[in-house]
C-alpha cells in the first residue's frame, strides 16, 4: 500500500499527517481552523486519498503557521507515499465548477516543484480565515510534494466557492495523477526512466 506518515514539530506548530493514496477518501482532520478543516475534508473525499491531520499551532498569533506547515507535512507525506512513482498516470487536469465559480487545476507529478496560482478573492476573509492563506497552502503543498501545479480560477464571485473549487480541483487532479496506469506495466512515466531530475 502507498502510505506515509509525517510528523513535524517546530516552536510554532506540532503536526502529524498520514495518507493512504489507495484509500476511500476518509478523513480525520483537526487543525483548530474550521474552514481549513473543511477544505482538507473535501481534499480527502474527492481525491480518494485517506487523510489524517492532527495539528496544534500558535492560533493565538494567526492561522498562517498552521496552514503553511500542514501544507508542508501533507506534501511530504504524498511524496513519500508515491515512492519511485513507478506506474503512476503522472499528468491530470480538471475543470471544477462550484456554483458560479469555475477553476482549472492541472498537475504533473514530475519531481520538479512549481506552483502557478492565478486566483483572486473578492474578500480578504472567509469567516476568520485569511484568503491569502489559500495560496500559502498550495505553495507549501506543491513544493514539498515535488509536483508541478497550475491553479487558475477562470471566474467566480464568492470567496468560499473559489477556495472550494481550487481544493476540489486539486483533489480530482490528484486522484487521476496518482492512479496506477495499467498500461504502464510498472514503468516510471518518463523517457529518462526517472522523475525528479
Curated annotation (Swiss-Prot):
UniProt main location, coarse: cytoplasm
InterPro entries, alphabetized: IGPD_sf, ImidazoleglycerolP_deHydtase, ImidazoleglycerP_deHydtase_CS, Ribosomal_Su5_D2-typ_SF
Subcellular location: Cytoplasm
Alphabetical GO biological process terms: L-histidine biosynthetic process
Pathway: Amino-acid biosynthesis; L-histidine biosynthesis; L-histidine from 5-phospho-alpha-D-ribose 1-diphosphate: step 6/9
Keyword annotations: Amino-acid biosynthesis, Cytoplasm, Histidine biosynthesis, Lyase
Main EC class the enzyme belongs to: lyase
Reactions accelerated catalytically: D-erythro-1-(imidazol-4-yl)glycerol 3-phosphate = 3-(imidazol-4-yl)-2-oxopropyl phosphate + H2O
E.C. number(s) listed in UniProt: 4.2.1.19
Molecular function terms from GO: imidazoleglycerol-phosphate dehydratase activity
Any one GO CC term of the record: cytoplasm
UniProt cross-references to CDD domains, sorted A to Z: IGPD
Entry superkingdom: Bacteria
Pfam families membership: IGPD
Disulfide topology: none
Entry similarity comment: Belongs to the imidazoleglycerol-phosphate dehydratase family.
Classification via PANTHER family: IMIDAZOLEGLYCEROL-PHOSPHATE DEHYDRATASE, IMIDAZOLEGLYCEROL-PHOSPHATE DEHYDRATASE HIS7
Identification of the protein by name: Imidazoleglycerol-phosphate dehydratase
UniProt source species: Afipia carboxidovorans (strain ATCC 49405 / DSM 1227 / KCTC 32145 / OM5) (Oligotropha carboxidovorans)
Amino acid at each position: 500500500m502507498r502510505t506515509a506518515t509525517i510528523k513535524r514539530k517546530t516552536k510554532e506548530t506540532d503536526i502529524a499527517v498520514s495518507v493512504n493514496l489507495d484509500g476511500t477518501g476518509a478523513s480525520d482532520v483537526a487543525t483548530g481552523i474550521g474552514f481549513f478543516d473543511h477544505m482538507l475534508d473535501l481534499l480527502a473525499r474527492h481525491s480518494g486519498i485517506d487523510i489524517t491531520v492532527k495539528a496544534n499551532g500558535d492560533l493565538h498569533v494567526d492561522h498562517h503557521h498552521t496552514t503553511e506547515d500542514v501544507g508542508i507535512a501533507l506534501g511530504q507525506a504524498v511524496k513519500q507515499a508515491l515512492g519511485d512513482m513507478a506506474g503512476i498516470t503522472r499528468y491530470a487536469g480538471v475543470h471544477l465548477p462550484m456554483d458560479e465559480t469555475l477553476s482549472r487545476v492541472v498537475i504533473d507529478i514530475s519531481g520538479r516543484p512549481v506552483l502557478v496560482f492565478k486566483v483572486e478573492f473578492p474578500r480578504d476573509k472567509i469567516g476568520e480565515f485569511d484568503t491569502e492563506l489559500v495560496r500559502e497552502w498550495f505553495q507549501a503543498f506543491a513544493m514539498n510534494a515535488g509536483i508541478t501545479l497550475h491553479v487558475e480560477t477562470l471566474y467566480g464571485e464568492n470567496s468560499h466557492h473559489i477556495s472550494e473549487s481550487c481544493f476540489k480541483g486539486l483533489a480530482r487532479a490528484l486522484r487521476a495523477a496518482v492512479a496506477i496506469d495499467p498500461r504502464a506495466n510498472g514503468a516510471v512515466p518518463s523517457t529518462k526512466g526517472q522523475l525528479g531530475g
